[in-house]
Every structure is written in structure tokens, then in C-alpha cells.
A protein has these predicted regions:
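Nucleotidyltransferase catalytic core that binds NTPs
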Residues: 2-234, 243-245, 275
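Phosphate/ribose-recognition catalytic cores of enzymes acting on nucleotide-derived substrates
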Residues: 224-279
Length: 279
């Protein structure tokens, strides 16, 4: 496994692999990898000749109240995990090589103004910008994203379509702990009591899945989910919403494919979860 730290050396390696006719898969990450990331890398390994993992804490997706420096980092552990999973290359650039001020941004506004975009207004602009940069640097045949970040996945798909990237976007299932909590680096911030309280998210997902059906009013589903979360004293709802699976806009009734998503604070830690329903 190789590690590159500049755009130039990454492109040189990719160029050689392309000359050999190799297919390339990319798993974009911000590091501090867990089993959710591992599932993406495994899927990528199954479907491509070359597996590239980006390990880059992207500064442009952090808002003014979000602490970039506090984001957890452990590149040694990340690289060991990637090597065990059969990755061929880790792209680990310095921010100064990725961004030169002033720099351009990529933004998909129509899908970014609901759900997480309401309270994190610059987040998806930063995500789209760094992902488009990685796509241009790595030029992968396929790129892998987790469905836990469902709004992000929808935005990336839209960006690829609108900007004519010749890349297949592969969405991979949410990976959960044995008790149902969705895997996340943020879980490490939870105290023992908060960790137990956080299970209200997966219980709410289960209640929503048990309730939803074609034609039902969105509020009937969302009310049951909110009740479960509101019964937990340590939980504070950011949002619990049902949106169109394609344009991320709110729906009043289940008449097409939908995404049911939530963001909930457990203490000071913001967690997300979701499920999809196909009509």
C-alpha cells in the first residue's frame, strides 16, 4: 500500500494504473476510520482493481461554530486498517495543497437547504467542493459513500449528474452496533449514560419503519418517532423529517420514494440516522 501527500504524486500513480487498464475505486473519508468506513473499503475492493482511500479532514465543510482542530485524527491507525482491508493507496494531502486562497466552490443549493443543511448552511458546499476535487485528482470509475449520510449521498449523485462526471456513485448500507446504534466517530464522544440514551434514535427508526406505508400522512410517521426521542431526557431533537428521496424537499404524504431522517443531540453530541422507503 502506498501513501501520497500531494496532488502531483497522486496523479502520477493514477496515470500509471490507468495506462495498465486498471479500474479504480475511491472511498472518500475524513479519517478516524470505523467499521462503517471498513464496509465501504471492502465493497470497493470487491468491485475494482485499485482501491484508493482519501484521508483528509476537509476544512471547508466546518462551520464557524464547529471546531476543525477538535476533529479526531489517527492516521497511523487509519493506514493500518486500510492496509489490512487491501487498499492500494491512501491519499493524505496537506490542506495547502488542496486549497489555494481564494478558491472556487461547488454548491448544489436545491438539495442543501433542508435537513442538515438548515443548521449547517456551508457544510454541503464544502463537501461538494472537496469531493469534486478528489474526483478530478483520482478520476475513479466508482466512488463509495455510506447511506447514513443520505442527504450527502443525494447531493453527490446530483453533482455527478449535473457536472457530467463519468463516475458510478455506489451507496452502501448503514453499519450499526449490535444494539442498533449507527456507527459514527461521534459515538466516541458519548458518556456511558449518553451511549444508552442514544439508542432512542434506532428505536425511532424502527418505529418509523413499522408505521410507514404507501398513502400514509408523513406526520403520522414522524409523530411516533418524535415521541420516542422526546421520552429520552438526554435527547434534544434538531429535526425529524420526511423528504422526497430525490430532491430532499418535505412531503406531506407517502406517494413516492421518501427518506425519513433525523438529527438528535445526545448531550452535546449531534447524531444522525435515517431510513428509506420505496413506493
Amino acid at each position: 500500500m502506498q501513501v501520497t501527500k500531494t496532488v502531483q504524486e497522486t496523479r502520477a500513480l493514477i496515470k500509471n494504473w490507468k495506462k495498465e487498464g486498471k479500474t479504480i475505486g475511491l472511498v472518500p473519508t475524513m479519517g478516524f476510520l470505523h467499521e462503517g468506513h471498513a464496509s465501504l473499503i471492502k465493497r470497493c475492493r470487491e468491485e475494482n482493481d485499485i482501491v484508493v482511500v482519501s484521508d483528509f479532514v476537509n476544512p471547508t465543510q466546518f462551520g464557524p461554530t464547529e471546531d476543525l482542530e477538535a476533529y479526531p485524527r489517527d492516521f497511523k491507525r487509519d493506514s493500518e486498517l486500510c492496509e489490512c482491508l487491501g487498499a492500494d493507496l491512501i491519499v493524505h494531502p496537506d490542506p495547502t495543497d488542496m486549497y489555494h486562497d481564494p478558491h472556487a466552490f461547488v454548491s448544489i443549493d436545491t438539495l442543501s437547504d433542508t435537513l442538515c443543511g438548515k443548521t449547517r448552511p456551508i457544510h454541503f458546499k464544502g463537501v461538494c467542493t472537496v469531493v469534486s476535487k478528489l474526483f478530478n485528482i483520482v478520476t475513479p470509475d466508482r466512488a463509495y459513500f455510506g447511506q447514513k449520510d443520505a442527504q450527502q449521498l443525494a447531493i453527490i449523485r446530483k453533482m455527478v449528474q449535473d457536472l457530467n462526471f463519468d463516475i458510478q456513485i455506489v451507496g452502501c448500507p448503514i453499519i450499526r452496533e449490535e444494539d442498533g446504534l449507527a456507527k459514527s466517530y461521534r459515538n466516541t464522544y458519548l458518556s456511558e449514560k449518553e451511549r444508552t440514551a442514544a439508542l432512542c434514535l434506532s428505536r425511532a427508526v424502527k418505529a418509523g419503519q413499522d408505521t410507514i406505508c404507501k398513502g400514509i400522512k408523513a406526520e403520522e410517521v414522524l409523530a411516533k418517532m418524535r415521541a420516542i426521542i422526546e421520552a429520552e431526557p438526554l435527547a434534544k431533537i434538531d429535526y425529524v423529517s420526511m423528504v422526497d428521496a430525490l430532491d430532499m424537499q418535505p412531503v406531506e404524504r407517502v406517494e413516492k420514494d421518501v427518506l425519513v431522517a433525523m438529527a438528535v443531540y445526545i448531550g452535546k453530541t449531534r447524531l444522525i440516522d435515517n431510513f428509506s422507503y420505496e413506493v
